[in-house]
Amino acid sequence: MTTTNSHEFWDDRTVMVTGGSGFLGKHLVEDLESRSDDVEIFVPRSNEYDLRKKADIKRAFEDSSADTVIHLAATVGGIGANRENPGRYFYDNAVMGIQLIEQARQYGVEKFTILGTICAYPKHTPVPFKEQNLFGGYPEETNAPYGIAKKALLTQSKAYRKQWNFNSIYLLPVNLYGPRDDFDLETSHVIPAIIRKCIEARERGNDAITAWGTGEPTREFLYVKDAAEGILDATERYNASDPVNLGSGEEISIRKLINIIADQTGFEGDIEWDTSKPDGQPRRKLDTTRAKERFDWEASTAFREGLQATIEWYEDNRDDIHGDE
């Protein structure tokens, strides 16, 4: 990880972190607090500020006097949730992002960091995904509403820089994983879902677990603490319109991923593949050259190391997470 002293940038800033109480947000806030003793952090909680409503966004800026915004908040989920909620995922993410950027411009915000999504890439993007190919086709159908809503914010970012010199940057992370992830099987992504399934099957003595699709697609995963670091490093050091990928550089098939999780959780049963369920995009792997070149960032956590930390966190906290369900 980078070791540059970050105090000069963050000192005396007031940073609004939307989604700051979520999975990525909690890690980012902790990292940010460690970078400066003189930074003020404002997290607009969803029960107090509905960021889809202009009035609530205005109130958030009035209450915080933020000069820097890191926009992490999103309505998001796994393949199943995307299939069930395409309209909601499009509307929530588009409206929230577009209005936040516009109000930030009006309030004179000095720096705005937008978090995009790998789902914005075209379905058949050449691998590894390069930022210049982002608008080269239609996204994978399951994730298209979410991906297109997020990609619209890149167009807005570039337009606002051109017309008003508004300083916003746009980052594209791969799927994240790590401690505090979402382990609800209705909404979770593949890593937390399979960790939970394997541990519960092991404890019950089940002979098999079921996984979606064929297991053939490949994915890239980024440890959440690395992602938080990359976002903050970019906010400090990067000031340009070009989008930037954030990834680990490791590509793994879903089949191999699930076998690794089974091994690390101690589940010795079979993996049954439900091929009636979608695979999603065939391959995902990012070219992360630009992040290294533009703001000297690269991921540092080995996949199995991050996976073990995630499994241990879940086993230590699962009773608090699931309660009496």
Predicted region positions:
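Amphipathic terminal alpha-helices
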Residues: 1-14, 35, 39, 304-325
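C-terminal "lid/loop" region of Rossmann-like NAD(P)-dependent oxidoreductases
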Residues: 43-46, 209, 214, 241-244, ...
